Structure formats: structure tokens, C-alpha cells
Amino acid sequence: MKHYSFLLILFMALCLSLGNGNKAQAGSLQTKGVWVSCFEFEELGLKDKTEAQFRANANKIFATIRANGCNTVYFHVRAYDDAIYPSSVAGFSKYISSDGKAPGYDPLKILVSLAHSHKLKIHAWMNPYRVSSTKILDPASEMTTARIVNQVKEIINRYAVDGIHFDDYFYPTVDEG
């Protein structure tokens, strides 16, 4: 088994070293991204802020991301069947507003505008099934699929995001392994 693992690693290294010979194209398509999790919103100065404070702090975040050589940001817009934007499908995220009520401005609209002003692509990062630490939406349910599709449509019809990113399929479990 070790022999096969070594051969596989050697083969992958060889393939990666060959490249495609078109460095200009490869460089222009390279993605250097960072994920901004809802669990970091408070520390980053995005939670329970006025619009001006939110905008100033988001601007600093994007300036830092760009200064560190990144060109893409994956921003957590839906973590627990909630939304960081006004939604007809989901409640407002407690990670932006402690009371779960809209703050009187549209955080995602601001984020998209500021990201693009820093020449960053911004992807809406969603956890499609997670409702809480112990509850998930039923992945086999047509109602769940319709709910997720409606949330994606809501985002792509209202915001100039550069992509939708589904991630972190957390399922309740009692087994840590």
C-alpha cells in the first residue's frame, strides 16, 4: 500500500510540475481567497453596528484582504437557516444583529459593493441544511430543496455576487469520530 501511495504522490507532483505552458492565462485565472465566517463577525466589527460603522469596518476588512494578495472572498451569508440580508425566505442572522432583527440597512449590498470596489470577487457562502447545532433541514425533502433554491435565487437576483458557495454539511451526531 505504501508503494501505491508513493507512486500516486509522485504522479501528482509530476502532473503539477508540467503546468499548461500558458502562464499568462493561468495567472489570470488563479484564485487566492479567504473565508469570512459568521463566527468572526463580532471580532471584525460587523455585529450590532450602525450602517456607517459596518461600512467602515467592512472596508478595512476588504482592504486588508486585498493587501495580502487575495482576489476572492467567501462571505458567510447563511449559517443557520438565517440570512445577513433582508430575506423573504429566512430570518435575519443573529451574527449581524444580536436580536435577530434587520439593522435598518442591507449588509450584503454593502459587502458586495465594497468588495468590488477593492477589485475582489465575492461569493455568498451558505450552509444549506444546518438550522442549529442539533437540527438540520431534511436533504431528501422537496420543501428543503425549494427553500434552498429560493434563497439562492433571492441572492443572485438582488446582488452582484460572483458565486454561491455551499459548504460545511454538518449533521447532528453523538459520535465524535
Show the residue positions of the predicted features.
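Loop/turn elements at helix/coil->beta-strand transitions in domains of secreted/extracellular proteins
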Residues: L29-K32, N68-V73, H116-H123, Y159-G163, ...
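Active-site-proximal loop/short-helix segments
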Residues: D82-A90, R130-S132, S141, R158-G177
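Boundary at the C-terminal end of the N-terminal hydrophobic targeting segment
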Residues: A24-A26
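Bacterial N-terminal signal peptides
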Residues: L7-S17
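Positively charged n-region of N-terminal signal peptides that target proteins for export
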Residues: M1-F6
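Active-site-adjacent "subsite" loops/lids of carbohydrate-active enzymes
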Residues: S28-A56, L108, V112-S113, I122-Y159
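Catalytic domains of carbohydrate-active enzymes, especially glycoside hydrolases
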Residues: A56-D82, R158-G163
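Aromatic-lined carbohydrate-binding/catalytic grooves of carbohydrate-active enzymes
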Residues: N68-P103
